Amino acid sequence: MTDRNDSGSLAGLLAQGQDEFVARHVGPAGDDVTQMLATIGAGSLDALVAETVPGSILLDPGNKPALSIGEARTEAAALAELAGLAARNQVWRSYLGSGYHGTLTPEPIRRNVLENPGWYTAYTPYQAEISQGRLEALMVFQQMIIDLTGMEVANASLLDEATAAAEAMTMLRRASTSKAPGYFVEAGTHPQVIEVIRTRARWLEIPVTVGTLDALDPGTFYGAHLQNPDTEGRVRDLTDDIARLQAAGLKVCVGTDPLAAVLLKSAGAQGADVVIGSAQRFGIPLGF
């Protein structure tokens, strides 16, 4: 049992009303420190620091001003101070676009999905339960993507939309029976997606052409990447365009907005061979 009157124990500190983070979370306290110093032969914490820190970087209290780190804070005071600092941020409307969107994550989804401990265990987080919960979460995610894209299978998943687009380009190259060497990318594709496709294609020696569909020569390309909605927000029905390209021997990848797919005709129903997109739309905040 823990002695509540032991000034060096956590229980003792809390019993005395000492709710500072430094007492609760920063290493040992009281008799523990004394015993540890005696074990290693150091007379004090200052002596230990003087022996271990090189003199060229050691702050000498006798010659230099002490660090102004303030007094220890209680948990409530520390959280209030952090909230005050965060409130100084100015939140502006984002016009970044290019497939990146400001999002809202409804509290029921955050608590019951993202923070639901049932995904990994009902008691102690053993690895087996974490793996089982992760497997279930991935299965649900993949089924949702299948429903939204209209495809038969889905993975879970790649780094981002641009990486997925580059992987689609190489997958279509392997799946295609066409002798044409090039890959066509619609000009309305998000700019970062175009750049990653170009970078991947460079080392695979795949010629990439960025342009509009009406200028496309089907005999030059084995595959095409289309964007719907495109990077400027235009929405189209690609059914006829995809059918025309496939009739000419091209494989077609469509980059889509999965949230828009809730209302739009799915890319799979329009005939796409591969569908890619970004799950950032489902409530992941933007980070800079």
State each model region's role.
Residues Y126-I130, R134, D147-A166:
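Short loop-beta-helix segment that forms the pyridoxal 5′-phosphate
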Residues P28, E51-G55, L59-V140, I146:
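N-terminal entrance/gating region of PLP-dependent enzymes' catalytic architecture
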Residues G27-A50:
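Mature N-terminal segment immediately following signal peptide/propeptide cleavage
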Residues A15-Q16, N116-A128, M144-M151, S178-A180, ...:
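Gly-rich Lys/Arg/Thr-decorated short loops/hinges at beta-loop-alpha junctions or inter-strand turns
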Residues T74-L79, Q142, A154-K179:
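Conserved beta-loop-alpha segment that forms the PLP phosphate-binding cup at the N-terminus of a helix
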Residues M1-P28:
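Charged, compositionally biased N-terminal leader segments and the immediate start
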Residues T163-F288:
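Conserved PLP-enzyme active-site core in the AAT-like
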Residues A42-L58, P65, A272-G277:
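TRNA-binding/sensing appendages of the translation machinery
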